[in-house]
Amino acid sequence: MATRLQYENSCDVGVFLKLTNKYCLVGQCGSKQFLHTVENRLADHIPVVETSIAGTRIVGRLSAGNKNGLLLPNTCTDQELQQIRNSLPDDVVVQRIEEKFSALGNCIATNDYVALVHPDIDRETEEIIADVLGVEVFRQTVSGNVLVGTYCALTNQGALVHPMTSIADQDELSSLLQVPLVAGTVNRGNECVAAGCVVNDWTAIVGADTTATEISVIESIFALQGSKPSNIINNIRNSIVDNV
């Protein structure tokens, strides 16, 4: 099931959240209503950690992680690193890395088995991603965009990518990732799909502007609430008929 939320005045929930199957990071915010809603949705299953990274709230864009590990930029302070380490399960490896692209969440899209990364990411960073996250790593673009972590939302169940991704590119990405994949949008047509939603294998949090049709596609491709990827066309067709 997908939950609509707004982080203060922003619908870009993926900028301020990092959600995996093992934990959720939440950027420190003045409004506790957002945090309480996230905790009510997730806290029975995984730890929800309110934190900052490099003194900022954009934890979703600065970090990359999965059930095995969490990667943080070298601008993350010692205090932040220690707090995050102490708050996550013991079997989650938390590592700070030296990388010129410090917005790791924009440059890495990962599930528990495979990761797409910015084509120009350091070779050493690629090795750390493979080691800490326990994934196979592919240097890739999404619809010609190098910021794969911005334009691809990925779980073990499926992937949502930039709406202008060609059918050939969708097929290639789906083959690499070994999951069903669809091109789509969030927040009423926004192309930055991973900035507008966070997803794991059983739930999704999407920006408050996300339409019913966009939510139907998200719930279908990520197999939430028992939806199947084959339902996507019917969901879109029904929405078009309703609008007509």
Curated annotation (Swiss-Prot):
Q: What's the superkingdom here?
A: Eukaryota
A Gene Ontology BP annotation from the UniProt entry = maturation of 5.8S rRNA
Question: Which InterPro entries does this entry report, sorted A to Z?
Answer: eIF6
For whether the record's keyword set contains Phosphoprotein, the answer is no
Recite the UniProt keywords alphabetically. Cytoplasm, Initiation factor, Nucleus, Protein biosynthesis, Ribosome biogenesis
Fetch the SUPFAM superfamilies from UniProt. Pentein
Its recorded name reads: Eukaryotic translation initiation factor 6
